[in-house]
Regions:
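Glycine-rich flexible loops
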Residues: 1-204
């Protein structure tokens, strides 16, 4: 499967979620030094090849801030920009999301920070977490594959939902720093893949 086909596949998955991914979700994918990105405003239910463009030569533009950050990251190859319902509540409040579920500790990390929409802040945030919240905007989830970025999107919304609902009865108990680090490192080690295996996402 080529890059555009892979992006379209995950766009359709996002469109089929039982909740909204926000008014303008986007997908960014890096392959062989090139960056591909869905056009702003694309309806993921009806995505076509024309909705996916290469932006490698346009990384200095306002529209490609996240793509420029992805280009700088060494291991991550995919990003999803979305504002799901419970994550949106944290963005509105300007608060980071802490890990209260093992899934989040393993797949995303201990804490999802709030950052400004700048290449440097996004890059720095994603060096230690698989997600960041852009102040007043949306969440960015990333991964070594689109599957990982998509999984992080699902886990982040699930974690935010648990945190919000638990706040009614005094708040969720967050996982400790050491436990989070151990779970995260185990996940990365256990599910690490060679470059050839990662390329299976492209080759099908």
């Amino acid at each position: 499967m080529d890059q555009r086909g892979l992006i379209a596949e995950y766009a359709e998955k996002i469109a089929e979620l039982p909740y909204s991914a926000g008014p303008a979700p986007r997908i960014i994918f890096k392959k062989d030094g090139k960056i591909y990105m869905t056009r702003k405003g694309t309806d993921f239910r009806y995505i076509s090849d024309e909705d996916i463009c290469e932006v490698s030569g346009k990384l200095d533009q306002l529209d490609t801030v996240e793509a420029a950050a992805l280009m700088r990251l060494k291991k991550q190859k995919a990003m999803i920009l979305a504002r799901t319902p419970f994550v949106g509540k944290y963005i509105e409040a300007g608060k980071p999301i802490g890990a209260c579920l093992d899934d989040m500790a393993q797949i995303i990390g201990r804490r999802v920070p709030i950052v400004h929409r700048s290449v440097r802040e996004i890059q720095n945030g994603l060096e230690t977490s698989s997600a960041v919240l852009l102040k007043g905007r949306y969440a960015v989830t990333c991964g070594r594959t689109l599957y990982e970025a998509y999984t992080a999107l699902l886990v982040l919304e699930k974690s935010a939902k648990v945190n919000v609902k638990a706040s009614v009865i005094g708040g969720a108990r967050h996982i400790g720093k050491l436990d989070c680090r151990l779970m995260r490192n185990f996940y990365l080690y256990r599910y690490s893949k060679s470059e050839k295996e990662l390329d299976d996402d492209i080759e099908g």
